[in-house]
Amino acid sequence: MLSGGALIADLPTSPLNEEYTITGNETVNGQWYQHYQVGDNGILNIYGEGAMLTVNYGHNYSPTFSGSGIVNVGSDTDFGRLVVTSAGAFEDGWNNIINFTGTINVGYRGDFSISGEFPSHYGTIFSIRNLNIDGTVSVMPSIQNNASYFEVGNLNLSKDGMFTSEIDIQMTGNGVYNIYGNGFSAPRIRISQGESNVINLNGENLLSNIKTIDFQSYGGYLRINAYADNILNGFTFNSNAKLGISVSAGETLIIDNLKIENTNVSNVAIEFYDYTNGSFGIGDSDVWIEGNRLYIPSTDTYVDLIAYDAEGSVLSGIWSLDWDGYTNSFIFNQTVPEPAVFAVVLGGLALFCALRNRRRPRSR
């Protein structure tokens, strides 16, 4: 029985601060303002052939399912289902239906689905701090083109995991996404403010079903570590944003469509870590190099290019874009003058200055 006195099947009193395993079919009736919370010390397991927890929501004035503990949905050997759905449409209360600051683990035989008629607004509607997926997670709103976001702080998606969302995914500040398989599908990954957002790509073309990655607001940062060849469909800069890129030796990261949010964007940069020539490229776009900056004429925007070697020292050289017909992209290269070239240039300058001084008439 809940603390408010409302019976919710056989679930223990909310907040749950012990370990409890669902082996049958249990329900949270949020449409009747019956909410459920997993506390700091709570562990909620959904294990078994017919094990299912259904969370019915009927408003978003406050979260229907929340907590800071752990939820395990299925495992490597046990089935388990977590179903979040609505009883019908309702007026937008501008809060999260799920607001989970703990961890939700979806095992290999687990299934976590979100569906129903939830409000459409430019903001989060579901929020999970830590989401680990070995099984299946799906988000399918009843209304097409729903503008709300599914906020995921830290994501671990295994090689066999499937994460399909018909609404945008928002990475919270300083989040880490470890992607090992290509089962990730969503219209967009939105990058919110934070100084250490990271996406680790541990295989080839793992984000081919993500239409674009966008900086959502000013001052964003994202580092992409590509450990294999990857092509990103799109990437959008906003003002005061930095994209950090690290590509393993012999691999290539390509952004097919590099975009700028609008014509007022400024102070943006791409930083390359442990840089090697040929490791990064962009699709067939109307761009060119000016000094140590990439110029995008469609929005009259300059993107600073900064490269570091393996020791973290800045590489000073001449940038160029070279067309690669195999990948249909412009590959970035930086030519660093050899020490001998520097010596010749410096020697020439010294000789020029000496001759100039000799020819300068003496003052009277």
Language-model segments: residues:
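Surface-exposed loop/turn positions within long extracellular repeat scaffolds
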Residues: 5, 10-17, 27-67, 77-79, ...
